């Protein structure tokens, strides 16, 4: 029996040139990623050591990978920089301290911009924005700072608003917790009257557990007395102060996130599709602190 050998058809010149172009493009992308990784200094070469507290829907480690609204964007940034994500889970206060001490390259998880934080780490461009909301039982209607008078308010130790919350006129007690779970448990048990948690987390919890009969209401702003809690936060990544090249590369990746609407798409996956998440504060507190007077915060108008 005669054996038949399969023979590839010869490529014409155009096909050869196209294949060569594709090969060069792929090689170029790999080289660019490699060059970026080589230029960026990190604690462990070739890896991005990332702090997170595991609060969903913002971030968690699932099957060894980062997931969640912020986590998936962080994974995108690492890939863009040609670095392998090296996530480390810890409580919020430990995240801040570890970044400050240079034990983490970067931290994330609905992290709000705060002027005091600019003194201990480099704060990235925002990935989205949110304001202060009061989480409470459905049968209450707390919506103002006056409503905190004589009442117990719970939040997480290390959150942006803690120093200001303690100054609210007549507030009954500010109860601080190491984790959001602790706050939530006491709110459900009636041991605190209201809670201030990351709005994405609360919105996700409310949608997943309607039987808890919780809601969250925006606080009536009083910017003259309580500027931090009366404005929208820039949600950012916190970067090791000793890694300015990393910060520059991270900001370049975040610029692409806004351009490609990746933050809008990722938030929508977790039920956070309202345009308000992508509208910056009218008066940006970063101006003349870590951004100059010409700074324009990114928006996602082109994504809607």
Regions found by a protein language model. Name each.
Residues 36-65, 141, 146-150, 291-304:
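Immediate post-signal peptide segment of exported/extracytoplasmic ligand-binding proteins
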Residues 71-80, 146-147, 151-152, 159, ...:
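Extended ligand-binding regions for polar small-molecule ligands
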Residues 94-97, 109-119, 164-167, 193-231, ...:
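A ligand-binding cleft/hinge motif common to bilobed small-molecule-binding domains
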Residues 38-111:
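Extracytoplasmic small-molecule ligand-binding "clamshell" domains
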């Amino acid at each position: 029996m005669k054996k038949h050998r399969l023979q590839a058809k010869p490529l014409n010149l155009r096909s050869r040139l196209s294949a060569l172009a594709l090969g060069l493009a792929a090689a170029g992308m790999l080289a660019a990623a490699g060059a970026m990784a080589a230029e960026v200094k990190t604690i462990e070469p070739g890896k991005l050591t990332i702090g997170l507290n595991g609060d969903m829907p913002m971030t968690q480690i699932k099957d060894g990978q980062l997931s969640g609204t912020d986590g998936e964007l962080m994974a995108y940034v690492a890939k863009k920089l040609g670095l392998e994500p090296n996530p480390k889970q810890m409580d919020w206060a430990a995240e801040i301290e570890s970044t400050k001490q240079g034990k983490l390259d970067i931290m994330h998880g609905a992290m709000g911009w705060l002027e005091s934080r600019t003194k201990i780490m480099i704060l990235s461009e925002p990935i989205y924005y949110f304001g202060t909301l009061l989480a409470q039982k459905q049968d209450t209607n707390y919506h103002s700072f006056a409503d905190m008078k004589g009442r117990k308010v719970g939040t997480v130790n290390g959150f942006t608003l803690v120093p200001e919350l303690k100054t609210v006129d007549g507030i009954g007690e500010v109860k601080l917790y190491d984790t959001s779970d602790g706050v939530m448990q006491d709110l459900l048990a009636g041991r605190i009257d209201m809670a201030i948690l990351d709005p994405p987390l609360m919105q996700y919890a409310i949608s997943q557990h309607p039987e808890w009969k919780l809601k969250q209401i925006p606080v009536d702003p009083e910017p003259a007395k309580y500027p931090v809690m009366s404005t929208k936060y820039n949600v950012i990544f916190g970067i090791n102060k000793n890694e300015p090249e990393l910060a520059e590369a991270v900001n370049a990746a975040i610029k692409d996130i806004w351009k490609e609407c990746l933050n809008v798409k990722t938030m929508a996956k977790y039920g956070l599709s309202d345009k308000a998440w992508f509208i910056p504060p009218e008066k940006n507190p970063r101006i003349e602190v870590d951004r100059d007077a010409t700074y324009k915060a990114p928006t996602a108008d082109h994504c809607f």
